[in-house]
Swiss-Prot record:
Its main location: membrane. It is a single-pass membrane protein. The chain crosses the membrane at residues 11-31. It is found in: Cell membrane. This is Uncharacterized protein YPO1740/y2567/YP_1481. The keyword Transcription does not apply. Residues 67-91 are annotated as: Disordered.
């Protein structure tokens, strides 16, 4: 009788650490996966920001070529940001 009780405790003493290790491995897997996804999203957002900077530079160069103005010159075709001070866009 005592032998059967000890075998049940023996199985429980082995199963509990195994389940604990399995639980922590599963948690580690999902945390690692979330970290990798976050790093990918940060990398993609940086690429998008860099592309937008290049597009802005190209558009500025095209505007300068089309109007023949530089940053220090004013022209009647260029629009001042103050012109849109009270402007509310439609949604």
């Amino acid at each position: 009788m005592l032998d059967t009780n000890m075998s049940a405790f023996g199985v429980a003493s082995i199963a509990l650490p195994l389940l604990t290790v399995l639980f922590f491995l599963i948690v580690w897997f999902f945390l690692s996966r979330a970290s990798v996804r976050a790093n990918e999203q940060v990398r993609l957002l940086r690429e998008i920001a860099e592309q937008q900077k290049r597009q802005t530079e190209l558009l500025t160069a095209l505007l300068e070529n089309a109007t023949g103005t530089r940053d220090g010159q004013n022209d009647s075709d260029t629009v001042s940001p103050l012109d849109f001070k009270g402007f509310i866009p439609e949604r």
